[in-house]
Amino acid sequence: MNVFKNFEKKIKKSLELSDIKGKNGEDLNLSKITVDPPRDSSHGHLSTNAAMVLAKSIGLNPHALAEKIIELLKNDSSIDCIDIAAPGFINIKLTKSFWQDAIKSMLKKGTSYGRIPMGQGKRINVEYVSANPTGPMHVGHCRGAVFGDVLSNLLQFVGYNITKEYYINDAGKQIEVLAHSVLLRYREALGQKINEIPEGLYPGEYLIPLGQSLAQEFSDQLLTIDKDEALSIVKERAIYAMMSMIRKDLAALNIYHDIFFSERMLYADNARAIRNTINDLTLNGYIYKGELPPPKGQNTEDWEPREQTLFRSTDVGDDQDRVLVKSDGSYTYFAADVAYFRDKFNRHFDEMIYILGADHAGYVKRLEAMAKAISGNSAKLSVFLCQLVKLFRNGHPVRMSKRAGSFVTLRDVVEEVGRDPVRFMMLYRKCEAPLDFDFAKVTEQSKDNPIFYVQYASARCHSVFRQAQEIFRIENVSNDTMIAHLNRLTDDNEIFLIRKLSEYPRIIEQAVVHKEPHRLAFYLYDLASSFHAHWNKGSDNFDLRFIQPDDKELSFARLGLIQAIMNILSSGLAIVGIEAATEMR
């Protein structure tokens, strides 16, 4: 039950059935009416902007219209009181029996509460991580990995059919560099002295075991056979080894993709997928032969002062046309990207989501252009850019140097602080905002550490049930037993917690609509904080404690409140990819 949506519908229905019309007698446009929690909880339980958004079209001032709307709602038995806040917002306070019924509904739905049927089975492809297979995942990949995974879980929760996809960039120059870097480590494993890693090769020590493995498998054969053949063998082994490493890194974060799509597949059969893509674009008038001026202040790697095969991407919103085939007949990276999008489009997804690093900001327009050209403007495309993660230790920056091969890996972070803190904290800022990750803060046992505070709330809830079992000498308390006594929940603090719980479906809906899973993390912390605040009041006032040894019925009612909190913490944390704690260790 979404309390806010239900009251929005009530208000709209009341207006539709009323004699309130526009200035010229026309029906009202009710689409901008919303019902939300008031900014100040002391102002009521619900607040609507109905009078504010309709006043001008009706020809009344907002306050006068608010009075008319209040008149329409005055006979609603669920409303305790209703008033107007300047200049025309309507604040509503609901009855305690309404909130008792609300928590009854929550308990009946269990962990399915908040599971709004928004997706209706529509198919969405979410591509995330897609790190180059040239080494272990570093902490910079971590944020996009968590964002993509939680967004996928969130969309799945409300009924979308999700495909989690990883694009393996295994056909570009970086693979050549990787192969030469591994060959160097191979020669080192054979006993050759390697003084310094040449500029441009990967210097990380993570390649040493691969060099040793090749030496064990091939002895010195790779130095005696044809160089191209040796390089081909090393490439295959290196890509396999790097992707195995990356899969293990992702598994450490509890991330598992459905599909790993190899870029090399696009080049199979004489690059048939790319050729077919260019043919399709040609038929639709997007391909021509020509020259491009050198890009100002940008990478000129794909620029040549010669005739090339160009994609007329400016026709579909790009800043400049893009090279697909160079003058020597070789394909650009972008040609493979367009072919990859075409492959996705031909798999008939209703929407395609790309999650990229902030350094890909300049890539968004060409992505959108290729989507319009390939799909005839029918594809729904969403692109998200995840900003950088800055590492700190006790407030001091952690220095990293990719050139020196010294960077903090994803596995390093997970092994030091644990999977759950990493997942939660990577989500604890909007993805477009930079994120500071302090190793000390995320392991701190205080309210300033969001994941600790949320898990502590879950553990405390479980402890209340254990206390009830001990005091009342019962093995468990059934849902029906708790529901039967919910009318005993009358304290304002209890009603406040029920109101906080009732926001969950609204938070889920907003997080899905805006594709902002950080809203869920914020809500879970907010709910945990409200719970802890009530718990602390019980330390000062025995009557507010959840278990009342001399009043079993009140205790059962409060256990119902605890169960509802547990259900939502468990549900929300599951979407984040975290198991709710039953006790703190």
UniProtKB/Swiss-Prot annotation:
Reaction catalysis annotation: tRNA(Arg) + L-arginine + ATP = L-arginyl-tRNA(Arg) + AMP + diphosphate
GO cellular component labels: cytoplasm
Main location: cytoplasm
Subunit comment: Monomer.
Class in the EC hierarchy, top level: ligase
Motif ('HIGH' region): 131-141
Record protein name field: Arginine--tRNA ligase
EC nos: 6.1.1.19
Gene3D superfamilies xrefs: Arginyl tRNA synthetase N-terminal domain, HUPs, Isoleucyl-tRNA Synthetase, Domain 1
Keywords: Aminoacyl-tRNA synthetase, ATP-binding, Cytoplasm, Ligase, Nucleotide-binding, Protein biosynthesis
Natural source organism: Bartonella quintana (strain Toulouse)
Biological process terms in GO annotation: arginyl-tRNA aminoacylation
Family: Belongs to the class-I aminoacyl-tRNA synthetase family.
Any GO molecular function: ATP binding
NCBIfam families: argS (TIGR00456)
